[in-house]
Structures are given as C-alpha cells and as structure tokens.
Curated annotation (Swiss-Prot):
Any one Gene Ontology BP term: sporulation resulting in formation of a cellular spore
Gene Ontology terms, MF aspect: ATP binding; protein serine kinase activity; protein serine/threonine kinase activity; sigma factor antagonist activity
Protein name: Anti-sigma F factor
UniProt xrefs under NCBIfam families: spIIAB (TIGR01925)
Function: Binds to sigma F and blocks its ability to form an RNA polymerase holoenzyme (E-sigma F). Phosphorylates SpoIIAA on a serine residue. This phosphorylation may enable SpoIIAA to act as an anti-anti-sigma factor that counteracts SpoIIAB and thus releases sigma F from inhibition.
Domain of life: Bacteria
Assigned keywords, A-Z: ATP-binding, Kinase, Nucleotide-binding, Serine/threonine-protein kinase, Sporulation, Transferase
Matching InterPro entries: Anti-sigma-factor_SerPK (IPR050267), Anti-sigma_F (IPR010194), HATPase_C_sf (IPR036890)
EC number: 2.7.11.1
Pfam family, one: HATPase_c_2
Length: 143
C-alpha cells in the first residue's frame, strides 16, 4: 500500500474526543493493525485531544481542534493541533504527574501515556498561539 491521509476539525467540546479517536482508528484500519495497536493509537489520540480541549481552550467550547493523519506503508503520523493558550514550558508539561489544572481531578499523565503508546512524540507550542502534538507509530506486520 502506498500512502493516504485525512484531515478533520471539530469544536473543543469534550464529547468530540470519542469521535476523534474512533475516526482515527477507522482511518488506520486500512493497514490491518492488531487490536493492541488500534487501542494504543486510540488512547494516544484521546489524550492529545483531551489536552487540547481542557488545557488549550479551558472552558471555551468554540475553539477548533484539528487532526491530520497520514499513513505510508506501516507508518502512521498523527498531528493534533489547537489555537489555544499554548504551553509556557513544554518540558515541564511533559513531566509525569505535572498538571496545569490542579483544580480538575486529572493525573498529569497525558504526555506520558502518549509517549508510552506511540513510538515518537513531539510537542510544539507557543504561549498564546496554540499547541501542535506530533505522534508517530510504526505498525508491526502480521505475516
């Protein structure tokens, strides 16, 4: 199989998180991933989208979350992007158990979860200009 890609965007409403992970899972299903690989990708997408909604936009439900997904052979690249408040200190934000919203019952493990389930994670952010999360995963061939 050669390459394929898709883009979508949706409002920063928490109910759209499940839509996003199911849409990405459906898109990558053309690569015939294992159930474990699908679960890994869905979990990482869920964490990235949740971060955009909760941390990027806070209580605003009119923000836009964008997802791009590209596949080439067995390689998947997923980009989750928002135009929210951005991250002041990306390195600190990626520290396990750190949260910028202690008022919420969150564990501060979102980036750690993304790193665990994906092969590569890169976070680009500018304060007041949003965040871009780039995740990559190479699927194992079942042959």
């Amino acid at each position: 199989m050669s390459g394929n890609k898709m883009k979508m965007e949706f409002l920063s409403k928490s109910q759209n998180e499940s839509f996003a992970r199911v849409a990405v899972a459906a898109f990558i299903s053309q690569l015939d991933p294992t159930m474990e690989e699908i679960t890994d990708v869905k979990t990482a997408v869920s964490e990235a989208v949740t971060n955009s909604i909760i941390h990027g936009y806070g209580d605003r439900e009119d923000g836009i979350v964008k997802i791009q997904c590209e596949i080439f052979e067995k390689d998947i690249t997923i980009i989750v992007e928002d135009d929210g408040i951005g991250i002041e200190d990306v390195k600190q934000a990626m520290t396990p158990l750190y949260t910028s919203r202690p008022d919420l019952e969150r564990s501060g493990m979102g980036f750690t979860v993304m790193e665990t389930f994906m092969d590569e994670l890169r976070v680009e952010s500018t304060e007041k200009n949003g965040t871009r999360i780039i995740m990559k995963k190479k699927l194992k061939s079942i042959e």
